[in-house]
Amino acid sequence: MYFTVTLAHQGSHLLTDEITRLRAAVRQTMRERPFYIDAMVVLPDHIHAVWTLPNGDSDYSVRWGAIKARFTRSLRNDCKVGFNPTMAKEMGYAVGWNPTLHRSPSKQIKGDAGIWQRRFWEHHVRNQREMQVLINHCHTNPVKHGLVKDEKEWPYSSVHRDTRPRQYNHA
């Protein structure tokens, strides 16, 4: 499966500013509901990922929901109320959560923090060739967005995992 998951506020740097929180949310979700990350890149305001789920399991929505919820909860738990998450660090504070960010009435009723776009885009990968195209898309996306000149310069990408020499255990 290929995914694009986006923050509600285009131009935010929250995902890269808070990469440790995001990585923790992904790791915890993987422990509870296993999946394999074929490729993943975290940009300041969105994520591209290619995942393989266990045979017979297609519940990727629950996994993304858990990742989003854990990330958001981590921000809320450490917040200094009244500060926007993207501005708190510039002001010398720990990350904050601003409950006054513009949220639709339905998001307010559901307690949605207004950090994430409500849904995500997914695409079922049809074959190995398409899988490789989508993996390459993940890895080259920071270049496409002008964040780096070479994909290996972007620190928040599985390209580093995929270019390391493989180590095998010899029994």
Where does each model-flagged region fall?
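Short catalytic/metal-binding and nucleic-acid-binding patches
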Residues: 1-171
